[in-house]
């Protein structure tokens, strides 16, 4: 059900976001306590202003109210994905090459499920990371079918 809702919302949101020269990054539909939240993440090369979030929220809300594809009450939240943006689409991974990323896998690889390092390459099937372990550097390859989630990582 939740996946179907996100797919429906993506179909409504994509043309709205494109018309405003923005990018649809992700859609989440989650229950927290007794409340349902529909979160839509947008971005652009220059970042996102609050007015743009408001414009997308208003237009998307009108479209969803008109068609009413979601069976119960929910809170709509349109925002930027933030500094630790999720990496979900092929384009996201390609744009992240050379940047610090955090990868979580479904099952351990070399005894670990969490990896943080520089994304060296992405070929559609495999992520190659450069890990720094104390003073050592280690390259690791992670098959995409083993990736539970991936995001940009903020380093200080």
Curated annotation (Swiss-Prot):
One matching Pfam family: DUF150_C
UniProt keyword annotation of Cytoplasm present: yes
SS bond partners: none
Family annotation (InterPro entries): Ribosome_maturation_RimP, RimP_C, RimP_C_sf, RimP_N, RimP_N_sf
GO biological process: ribosomal small subunit assembly; translation
A GO CC annotation given for this chain: cytosol
UniProtKB keywords: Cytoplasm, Ribosome biogenesis
Subcellular location: Cytoplasm
SUPFAM superfamilies: YhbC-like, C-terminal domain, YhbC-like, N-terminal domain
Entry superkingdom: Bacteria
Family to which this protein belongs: Belongs to the RimP family.
Functional summary from the UniProt entry: Required for maturation of 30S ribosomal subunits.
NCBIfam families: PRK00092.1-2
Protein name: Ribosome maturation factor RimP
